[in-house]
Amino acid sequence: RRLVAGDLAGLFDGPSTVRFDPTLPMLSLDLSRVTENATLVSVLMTCASAWMESALLDPAGGQRWVVYDEAWRLMSHPALLRRMDAHWRLARHYGIANMLIFHKLSDLDNVGDQGSAMRALASSLLANADTRVVYRQESDQLGSTATALGLTGTEQQLLPTLGTGQALWRIKHRSFVAQHQLHPAELELFDTTGRMTSNDSAHLPSEEPSGGLS
């Protein structure tokens, strides 16, 4: 009813304004403008997943990475979580590698209730990851991160000391510290600090008048 006559009416009543082209080297679905509407996110991701699966089922589609940024947000929707689980189980059949991205592992606390089937399913996706890449963690996250990922004491102590672009790589039972380098073209695409580092002073507050409070 919401899709036909309610607040979501008109969004899915006609052809898409964007063509899903699986021949492109990379496709990104940006949900940043709808993240406050959980129902809309769920519907959009369901449609996008149907697009994606049609491309993955193409025998001539080659191999692909499927990247889930802010993964906890998608995992909070049961249907999407089950679809992600299917992609994990059928990864070899689809010719894909899956990547989950979290700010911190405690984000999983947003997925279902403690002890629920949803929480267990989300945790199993993490447990089935052969490669874990962990960037610097704050001290209040160290215990839960170490427990969830099975880190050694040395690895746990290393995490708060990592610098920008440095990460602990856990591959099976081996670990490495890597310094990641971005190509300028990659930095232009993925730099999320642009507004904080801009030299544009047009919107900066002027200096306080003499005697003003700060």
What is each PLM-predicted segment?
Residues 1, 8, 12, 105, ...:
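Generic structural signal of hydrophobic/aromatic residues within well-ordered alpha-helices
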Residues 1-96, 100, 158, 167-172:
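P-loop NTPase motor domains
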Residues 16, 165-169, 196, 213-214:
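Compositionally biased, intrinsically disordered low-complexity regions
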Residues 44-46, 148-150, 183-185, 195-199:
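Short intrinsically disordered coil segments
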Residues 78, 85-183:
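Conserved ATP-driven motor cores of ASCE-family P-loop NTPases powering translocation/secretion/packaging/pilus
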Residues 186-190:
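C-terminal alpha-helical "lid" subdomain
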Residues 192-214:
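Acidic, low-complexity intrinsically disordered tails
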